[in-house]
């Protein structure tokens, strides 16, 4: 399974059943420190807040950090709690597993490396918020949220 190279990316919300939905879409957008990460169109005023640094760590997991201008401190994808539909928070960057979606080259499922009995904890979208979703580890559960990583 190919791993994502370290770099600067925009993250577009897609699904495993429709990894290339065409023009438009919503992108992971920072609102501010300790605020929920939003899903917004890639247009002003959101465009400048959709740039993320992905860094793979020695353990094979990755951090996703906001790479904006004039950032007073480092923050990225984080959480206060890993409950169903809890928001992804822009906070102290946590580690995630980036799992390539089969038959794609740039679409990944973002999973929290947390052991929950029988479920994977994945980053999806609800309304215009990035949230944590639970899916059965056996792969059932239908269409899953995924993210197209477009290099800047």
Curated annotation (Swiss-Prot):
Coiled coil: none
GO molecular function: cysteine-type endopeptidase inhibitor activity
Lineage: superkingdom: Eukaryota
Alphabetical UniProt keywords: Protease inhibitor, Thiol protease inhibitor
Pfam family, one: Inhibitor_I48
Family according to the record: Belongs to the protease inhibitor I48 family.
Chain's role: Binds and inhibits cysteine proteinases. Inhibits most strongly papain and cathepsin L, more weakly bromelain and cathepsin B while it is completely ineffective against cathepsin H.
UniProt subunit comment: Homodimer.
Annotated protein name in UniProt: Clitocypin-1
Species this chain originates from: Clitocybe nebularis
